[in-house]
Amino acid sequence: GMDKRYNYTLVNGVKIPSPDDKNRYIPLNIFPSDLMDRLVVSKSLTADMEGDAAGGVVDMVMKDAPSRFQIQANAAIGASDYFWKDGRDYLTSNRSDYTKKSPYEAFGSEYKAQMSDFKNGPVQLKSHSMPSPNFIGGLSIGNRFWNDRLGVMLAGSVQNVFRGTERTYNSVKMASGEQAMYISNLQHRYYSIHDLTAGAHAKIDLTLPGHKLEWYNMYVHTNSKGIRYNNSVNTEYIGADSYTQDDEVRSLSTTQSIFATNLKGTHHLAKDFTIDWSGVFSQAKEEDPDRTYVTLTN
C-alpha cells in the first residue's frame, strides 16, 4: 500500500540506483524485453534480501544466451493524443543553446557569475500544432560458443517520446469575519516534454560442470527537455473586482544516466553445499544545469 517512490529495482538480485532524488525505483521500460527471462515482484522482504525498508521490490532476471544464433528487432511508432487528438499546442525552446554547466561547475567557487554565462535558448520559445511522432526501437543479438559453454547477449534500445499533460492547482482562504471559503489563487499548468533515452546492455555467461559465472553490464542515458506554461489568477477577497494574472514559463533540461556492472558466480561444491557470490559496481547521475523562469504579471 506504500507509494511507488518507496519501491526499488533489482537486476539479477542486485539493486540498481535511481538518478531521481525523489524516487528509488527506475522505469522498467529502459530494459529490453528481449533480454528479460522473468519478472519477480515482492511486497515484503525475504531472508535473502538486504535489510532495506521498501514498499515493494521488482527483480528483473536476465536470461542466458540462446542455444543458437539469434537476432531480434522491434520498432513501434505512435503519438500522444494530448496533442494529436485534443489539438493542444506543443511548446519547444532552442535546444542547441542551453547552458551545459553552471558557472560554479565551469569556473569554480570563486568565480562571479555574469549574465553572459547563461544561454538564451530556454527563453526562445516556439509553438507547434503537433510534435513529431513517438518512436521506440530495439535490437538484440545472442549466440553460444565453445560447445555451448560460453553465451553472449547484446542489446540496444532507443526511445524518442513527446508527451504532454495539464494540471490545475488552487489555494483557499477564509474571509475575515465570515465563514465562507474562497479561492485566493488558481493555477492552470500545461506541460510539453521531450524524452530521448538510449541504452546498451550486455550479458556473458560461462557454464562449466558444477559452476556458472554471469557478467551483466548496462548503461542508460536519458535527456529530458520540458516547457511548463503556468497561468495563474490571484485575488485577496471574495467578490473583489481587483485581481492579478500571471503568466509564467519554466524551461528546463535534465540529463540522467545509469551505469551498472555485476559479476556473479554460483558453485555447487557438493550435493548439499552451494556457494554463490557477486561483485557489483553501479552509479547513477542526474544533472539539471539549466532551469529558467520567465514571469509576466498583468
Spans of model-derived segments:
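N-terminal periplasmic accessory domains that precede
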Residues: 1, 10, 24-30, 40-41, ...
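Residue-level detector of the transmembrane beta-barrel scaffold of outer-membrane proteins
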Residues: 10, 38, 70-74, 151-153, ...
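Short acidic/polar hinge/loop motifs at secondary-structure boundaries
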Residues: 14-43, 89-93
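Structural signature of outer-membrane beta-barrel domains
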Residues: 4, 16, 78-82, 159-163, ...
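Transmembrane beta-barrel wall of Gram-negative outer-membrane proteins
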Residues: 120-229, 256-263, 269-270
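Flexible, solvent-exposed coil segments and beta strand-coil junctions
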Residues: 19-20, 36, 113-122, 175-185, ...
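Short strand-turn segments of transmembrane beta-barrel domains in outer membranes
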Residues: 67-144
